[in-house]
A protein has these predicted regions:
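Short hydrophobic alpha-helical segments that form membrane-spanning helices or hydrophobic packing faces
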Residues: 45-51
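Amphipathic alpha-helical interface surfaces
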Residues: 28-31, 45, 61
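Catalytic Zn2+-binding segment of zinc metalloproteases
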Residues: 52-59
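C-terminal accessory module of base-excision DNA glycosylases/AP lyases that mediates lesion recognition
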Residues: 62-136
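Long, highly charged, low-complexity intrinsically disordered interaction regions
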Residues: 1-34
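Amphipathic alpha-helical segments within well-ordered protein domains
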Residues: 32-36, 50, 108
Length: 136
């Protein structure tokens, strides 16, 4: 685990962005960049904070997810905000799929507790990765 280092130079902006994220607003590239710079200069750290603030909208972005999606052994590109934004867009497209609701329900039943739609997709990716099932 990485020790948290906060850069509070843009404290007011960071608080405003986090409040926006909490109220179901999808934040933009510049806002994610400000959060990234404030939290260890880490997109992974920023995504984790966003996920804990609003798990319905923000998924965690980490090396395991990046490697699964890109099929790369390296994490070169994990810090690219566009990659994270595209990941969130992709998750939202999956959630909109007419068949997703029944799959989401099956995951609830399997785990014996409710998860967010984003978390259900993460669980599927984790299991596919563990079982070496391709992402396509």
């Amino acid at each position: 685990p990485t020790i948290l280092t906060l850069n509070l130079k843009d404290y007011d902006k960071v608080i405003s962005i986090l409040n926006s994220a909490k109220t179901c607003k999808q934040i933009d590239y510049n806002e994610i960049s400000i959060l990234k710079n404030a939290i260890n200069n880490s997109l992974v750290g920023a995504s984790k904070l966003l996920h804990f603030i609003n798990p319905e909208i923000y998924a965690i972005w980490d090396s395991r997810i990046f490697k699964y999606l890109t099929e790369k052994k390296s994490t070169y590109g994990i810090a690219d905000i566009d990659n994270y934004i595209n990941y969130l867009k992709g998750l939202n497209e999956i959630i909109k799929n007419k068949n997703f609701g029944s799959l989401h329900k099956e995951i609830h039943e399997y785990l014996n507790h409710k998860t967010t739609a984003m978390r259900s997709i993460e669980i599927i990716m984790f299991l596919c990765n563990k079982l070496s099932i391709n992402n396509y």
